[in-house]
From Swiss-Prot:
Transmembrane segments: none annotated. InterPro entries: MAGE, MAGE_N, MAGE_WH1, MAGE_WH2, MHD_dom. GO terms for cellular component: nucleus. This is Putative MAGE domain-containing protein MAGEA13P. Signal peptide: none annotated. It comes from Homo sapiens.
Length: 341
């Protein structure tokens, strides 16, 4: 895997002109996706919180521009060849010996992300022993922070969850987040999972009152350096992915804005999105990443609760019978937090 996920934490100072809690919702994943482009020494909490404060509410999808950047571990996965990176690292170590450990941690995070990506694409289990032996090696004392950052990268950028399958051997597998079944992995993009982009798009739509304009989606994606018409190492050609593939897969719907000339489009969730996940699960995903809970976003939380109740009522109406009343109630209760006072 090339070396440039590091540039994706960079234009974070821009942000979204949206309600404060909605900024926090999408800012969480944008910050993490950008962190697949910043420094290993940066703490997740400082990089996640409060990163999206204002993005111009007007305008059309942006194009790449040069700007000053701060950059981090997972982020470096896409840009610089390893030999160039190593030469730069050695030069930096000579100038600042204190930076050597941070550079080592950053490199090990990138190596572990590459290792985990191969395991995901080949559907092989992962053990702590092989991570230590094959990747971490003599840096075993630093395994916990390296593993934490690599896991965070896989979760946010690639949209994967790690599930333990054998507590004795510490064996785990990587699965797609939020119970999504989308698995479009093409040979020309090395089979990288695209669930992370799908989840981020769901978050933007939820933030935008359940229907996001194409311009708003690109505003957010441009922040993490995903541009319409620019092939991305992870996501392929993103305009095609969003406006055609995800629409064909029924994760999104594409609706032309009335009386728009030239035509403009907006995107709500599609029927497959509603069938496979819920607003509450999307909200909980972003909340977990930010180190908070869903009730930290009260307006979105209340909307997600209503969505849970409506789905429970639909089960009752469809299936009928008093015995299903209790199971539907239990399902709604187990998949959401208790309502705050």
């Amino acid at each position: 895997m090339p070396h440039s996920q590091k540039s994706r934490h960079c234009e974070l100072e821009q942000g979204l002109q949206a309600p404060k809690e909605a900024q926090g919702l999408v800012g969480v994943q944008v910050a993490e996706a950008e962190k697949v482009n910043t420094t290993a020494s940066s703490s997740p909490s400082t990089l996640i919180q409060g990163t999206l404060e204002k993005v111009s509410a007007s305008g059309t999808p942006g194009t790449p521009q040069s700007s000053q950047r701060v950059c981090s571990p997972c982020t470096t996965i896409k840009a610089t060849p390893w030999n160039q990176s190593d030469e730069s690292s050695r030069s930096q170590e000579k100038k600042d010996p204190g930076a050597s450990q941070a550079l080592m941690l950053e490199k090990k995070v990138d190596e572990l992300v590459k290792f985990l990506s191969v395991k995901y694409t080949t559907k092989q289990p992962i053990t702590e022993a092989e991570m230590l032996k094959g990747v971490i090696k003599e840096h075993k004392d630093h395994f916990p922070p390296i593993f934490m950052q690599a896991h965070e990268c896989m979760e946010i950028v690639f949209g994967t969850d790690m599930k333990e399958v054998d507590p004795i051997s510490h064996s785990c597998v990587l699965l797609k987040s939020l119970d999504l079944t989308y698995d479009r992995r093409l040979s020309d993009d090395q089979g990288m999972p695209k669930t992370g982009l799908l989840i981020l798009t769901f978050g933007v739509i939820l933030m935008e009152a359940n229907c996001a304009s194409e311009e708003k989606i690109w505003e957010v994606l441009n922040i993490i350096r995903v541009y319409a018409g620019w092939k991305d190492f992870i996501y392929g050609e993103p305009r095609k992915l969003i406006t055609r593939d995800l629409v064909q897969e029924k994760y999104l719907e594409c609706c032309q804005v009335s009386n728009s000339d030239p035509p403009r489009y907006k995107f709500p969730w599609g029927p497959r999105a509603h069938a496979e996940t819920t607003k509450m699960k999307v909200l909980e995903f972003f909340s977990r990443v930010s180190g908070s809970d869903a009730s930290s976003f009260p307006l979105l939380y209340e909307e997600a609760l209503r969505d849970e109740k409506e789905k429970a009522q639909a089960i009752i109406a469809t299936m009928g019978g008093t015995t299903l009343m209790a199971s539907a109630h239990s399902w709604a209760k187990s998949s959401s937090f208790s309502c705050p006072e």
